[in-house]
């Protein structure tokens, strides 16, 4: 669940910048404007460039630390692609044990083929490495989704309702004891889904974030995550879907969601962005 949640949470809140048409006749300008409108706005966000990275810290029942880095960003008239590295540590606070360390590498493709079309995002054959106290997991994951993955260029007036989004995901992992190259079990979830409900825009206000005092606005929605049929070591395990109420605090000047609040079963977890930077030395 943590893998799918991490992947799904991050793209929202990116602010795109309009691509200006080049010189030439009216027809050329119109064509350039049409291409710019059709491109996924996320690709033109000021932070969407090679070497950019974001650091997030979460509290609550599952404390976590997440660092995401973009590499090898390439743009096209209808979108972009990039390598996304996700390094995370997470743990159940009640267990008081060492964290689970997870490393993911995704080749992400973002497209919008027409101005009226939904933005799509896809990653195939992502490499997953995870390590816990007694075991490690290695394998592949994939996800595909359509909908609103960023808040750029949208009508964010108070009271506005934005459309949601749908993700389908799959993961196939082998489980190894630490220090051994012989797999002792497997885990497969081929029909996992994440449904994001309609988003409701709140009032722009000042917010004390871990990056300082910022102007931000709350955007709230319900999120339902289902692993679908889960196979562990050849045994079918049914996992109940989880439903969460989420509030993104989107800060336009930073073009990013600097805080996310997740409420589930009367418990609230907060995930804060602590750094949003570009490494000019990165490829």
Segments from the language model and where they lie:
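Acidic, serine/threonine-rich low-complexity disordered tracts
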Residues: 16-133, 176-283
């Amino acid at each position: 669940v943590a893998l799918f949640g991490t992947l799904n949470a991050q793209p929202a809140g990116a602010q795109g910048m309009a691509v200006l048409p080049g010189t030439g006749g009216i027809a050329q300008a119109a064509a350039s404007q049409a291409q710019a409108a059709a491109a996924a706005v996320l690709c033109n966000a000021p932070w969407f460039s090679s070497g950019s990275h974001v650091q997030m810290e979460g509290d609550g029942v599952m404390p976590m630390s997440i660092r995401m880095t973009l590499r090898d960003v390439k743009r096209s008239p209808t979108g972009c692609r990039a390598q996304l590295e996700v390094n995370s540590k997470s743990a159940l606070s009640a267990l008081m044990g060492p964290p689970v360390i997870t490393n993911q590498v995704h080749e992400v493709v973002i497209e919008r083929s027409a101005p009226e079309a939904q933005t799509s995002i896809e990653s195939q054959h992502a490499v997953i490495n995870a390590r816990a106290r007694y075991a490690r997991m290695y394998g592949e994951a994939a996800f595909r989704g359509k909908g609103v993955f960023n808040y750029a260029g949208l009508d964010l007036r108070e009271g506005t309702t934005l459309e949601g989004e749908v993700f389908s995901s799959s993961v196939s992992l082998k489980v190894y004891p630490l220090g051994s190259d012989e797999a002792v079990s497997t885990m497969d979830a081929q029909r996992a889904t994440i449904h994001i409900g309609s988003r409701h825009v709140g009032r722009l206000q000042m917010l004390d974030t871990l990056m300082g005092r910022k102007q931000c606005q709350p955007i709230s929605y319900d999120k339902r995550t289902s692993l679908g049929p889960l196979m562990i070591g050849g045994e079918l395990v049914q996992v109940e879907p989880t439903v969460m109420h989420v509030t993104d605090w989107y800060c336009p000047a930073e073009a990013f969601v600097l805080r996310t609040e997740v409420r589930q079963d009367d418990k609230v977890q907060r995930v804060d962005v602590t750094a949003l930077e570009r490494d000019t030395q990165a490829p």
